[in-house]
């Protein structure tokens, strides 16, 4: 891998996900080759914990990770879960994303809040909640943002960080978000 996008501790082990690195000599791209999640085995040893599809409709480029309900969850643009032995497709966190935006859909963050796995999305800065199986429900959009890069729980409340305005918002329930600050607010 050239880039590590996500790390998580699951089952007492460290897991890492990222890109596929450089293509083999003579090839221009990695078309069709799976993405991998690696498990740290100690010292300098890592093993492949799983291979995720690179082709649509169930593709997954490990960009975000979270641990929830006894499983490791990995996302971008779709979400997969790992129970320590087997990987399972958990759907596409679409929410209310318009049909024309679906080819661009990406998971940029994962977090657990009030017993549900949440995904922070691009291109519309939506938060989408996993409701079981391959099902997801929209939890609202953050202002005029385009991407949710960070989700966290603080003092029992859910917070999200979005670009392009460096905005931090708090979830107030159902589909309501309150903007706490825009760190980048150019005129116009």
Over which residues does each language-model region extend?
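Trp- and S/T/G-rich repeat-edge/linker motifs of beta-rich repeat architectures
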Residues: 1-5, 9, 13, 22-61, ...
């Amino acid at each position: 891998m050239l880039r590590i996008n996500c790390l998580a501790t699951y089952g007492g082990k460290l897991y890492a996900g990222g890109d596929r690195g450089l293509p083999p000599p003579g090839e221009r791209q990695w078309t069709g080759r799976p993405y991998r999640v690696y498990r740290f085995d100690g010292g300098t040893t890592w093993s492949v914990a799983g291979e995720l599809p690179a082709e649509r409709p169930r593709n997954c480029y490990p960009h975000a990770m979270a641990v929830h309900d006894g499983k490791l969850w990995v996302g971008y643009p779709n979400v997969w879960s790992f129970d320590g032995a087997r990987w399972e497709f958990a759907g596409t966190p679409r929410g209310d994303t318009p049909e024309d935006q679906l080819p661009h859909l990406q998971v940029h963050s994962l977090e657990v809040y009030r017993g549900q796995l949440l995904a922070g999305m691009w291109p519309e800065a939506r938060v989408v909640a996993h409701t079981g199986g391959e099902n997801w429900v929209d939890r609202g959009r953050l202002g005029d943002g385009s991407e949710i890069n960070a989700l966290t729980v603080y003092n029992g409340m859910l917070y999200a960080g979005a670009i392009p305005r460096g905005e931090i918002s708090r979830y107030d329930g159902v589909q309501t978000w309150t903007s706490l600050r825009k760190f980048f607010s150019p005129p116009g």
